[in-house]
């Protein structure tokens, strides 16, 4: 099966299908590489943050130690402590009088977690869409190619196996291309989705720890 024959045939639809497959494959692998690097750095940074938070009694000191660490847990700890300080600084305000510290911290920590996780959601929709649509786009290219191959064979009057196998074989490559693009996209989506879930679990655990420590915080 020679892809060169597909492009030499001049069929714009079949050529468009293969070009689209190529673009989808490039997008998939770019997203996979970028997301894997980002998740790796996040896990490595989170491990350092956990270690500092566990080994340091004072929350203020722990947050200062992790301030230079570029990690989701570091950002969450900094924003949670800043929210606590803002509340203590404005305890005389109407908001502080109407909203207990416990509820205020829950709201602020949840908002921080949502903002942090948005940074790790990019590309997932694209991977899911590519994994779901690539096989059907490839199948469309195959159906289109077979249809036009049969028309050309009928017009030429050549009904030999060699005349049928060549054009139809080239059209079937579109289905294989669709699977070649879709399978890595689906596997990458599942792998990255699991990585994101682990990150969410780490954030949940850290949020609970920060909430408890801030409620018992004596210093500001």
Swiss-Prot record:
Keyword Metal-binding part of the UniProt annotation? no
Q: Which UniProt keywords apply?
A: Cell inner membrane, Cell membrane, Membrane, Protein transport, Transmembrane, Transmembrane helix, Transport
Q: Which Pfam families match?
A: MotA_ExbB
Q: Which InterPro entries match?
A: ExbB/TolQ_transport (IPR050790), MotA_ExbB_proton_chnl (IPR002898)
Q: Where in the cell is it found?
A: Cell inner membrane
Membrane topology, from the record: Multi-pass membrane protein
Alphabetical GO biological process terms: protein import
Residue intervals passing through the bilayer: 13-33, 126-146, 168-188
Gene Ontology CC terms? plasma membrane
Family indicated by similarity: Belongs to the ExbB/TolQ family.
Per UniProt, subunit arrangement is: The accessory proteins ExbB and ExbD seem to form a complex with TonB.
Purpose = Involved in the TonB-dependent energy-dependent transport of various receptor-bound substrates. Protects ExbD from proteolytic degradation and functionally stabilizes TonB.
> What is the name of this protein?
Biopolymer transport protein ExbB
Species whose genome carries this gene:
Neisseria meningitidis serogroup B (strain ATCC BAA-335 / MC58)
Which gene is annotated as encoding this protein in its UniProt record?
exbB
């Amino acid at each position: 099966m020679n892809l060169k024959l597909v492009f030499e045939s001049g069929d714009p639809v079949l050529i468009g299908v293969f070009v689209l497959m190529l673009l989808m494959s490039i997008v998939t692998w770019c997203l996979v590489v970028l997301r894997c690097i980002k998740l790796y750095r996040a896990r490595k940074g989170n491990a350092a943050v956990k270690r500092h938070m566990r080994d340091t009694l004072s929350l203020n000191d722990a947050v200062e130690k992790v301030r230079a660490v570029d990690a989701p847990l570091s950002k969450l700890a900094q924003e949670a402590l800043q929210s606590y300080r803002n509340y203590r600084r404005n305890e005389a305000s109407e908001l502080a009088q109407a909203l207990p510290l416990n509820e205020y911290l829950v709201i602020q920590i949840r908002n921080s977690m949502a903002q942090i996780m948005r940074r790790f959601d990019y590309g997932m929709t694209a991977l899911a869409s590519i994994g779901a649509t690539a096989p059907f786009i490839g199948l469309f290219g195959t159906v289109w190619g077979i249809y036009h191959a049969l028309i050309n064979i009928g017009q030429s009057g050549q009904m030999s196996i060699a005349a049928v196998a060549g054009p139809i074989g080239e059209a079937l490559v579109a289905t294989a291309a669709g699977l070649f693009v879709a399978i890595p996209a689906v596997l990458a989506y599942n792998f990255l989705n699991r990585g994101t879930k682990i990150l969410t679990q780490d954030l949940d655990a850290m949020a609970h720890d920060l909430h408890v420590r801030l409620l018992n915080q004596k210093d500001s």
